[in-house]
Amino acid sequence: MRKLTFIVLLSLFCLMGRAVHAQQVDFAVGLSGVHSTSAADASGNFFPQDVGGGVFPTFSGDFLLFKHFGVGGEVSWRATRNLSNGFAPFRPIFYDFNAVYAPPLGKRAALELLGGFGGESIRFYQNFVTCGAFSCSNFVSSNHLLGDVGVGLKLYPFNNIFIRPEMRVYFIRNNFEFSDNHAERLGVSIGYTFGR
């Protein structure tokens, strides 16, 4: 009985190793810009302030579980503060979790289509510090649920290193602090693929 158990466990371990070998993991870092409706074009339901402008560093990763399908996530934030109404400093942060479809386009390229949900966290900075039970901060946050869709093109100039031009469209719920309820992010990321 012990011999049979050992053989079954060894077989499962070997099969698991083969399945793990077929998986792919990508990590990337990039820079992008965010664009949305300008403050001058804000409708009556939205505050006349643009969420875009400035440079947005981005960190992202994905894990392809089955052939070209997987999951991923990313976070982007404005590198410097912007001013709301010319006097109140703020910084938007976008984060999302996505379903990913990444079919290869030959040996040196892959398409990346994604869609999912996440959030927009807007930090409004103050000139004073507010303390709670465990920590202190100099900002208050306004958080909003968002849905996103995106596309990217991974180009592999060297083995597993890729350059990815990318676009994301965010549909932000109750984004009343800004001039519209959607924003577009355009950027370029450099990354590495494990398991390609």
List the predicted regions and their residue ranges.
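Gram-negative (and chloroplast) outer-membrane scaffold detector with strong preference
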Residues: 24, 31-33, 55-134, 144-147, ...
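Sec/Tat signal peptide C-region and signal peptidase I cleavage site
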Residues: 16-22
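Short glycine/proline-enriched turn or capping motifs at secondary-structure junctions
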Residues: 6, 177-188
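Surface-exposed strand-loop-strand hairpins of Gram-negative outer-membrane beta-barrel proteins
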Residues: 34-57, 142-143
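Extracellular loop and loop/strand-boundary signature of outer-membrane beta-barrel proteins
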Residues: 43-47, 82-88, 133-139, 173-178
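Bacterial N-terminal signal peptides that target proteins for export
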Residues: 1-7
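Bacterial N-terminal signal peptides
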Residues: 7-15
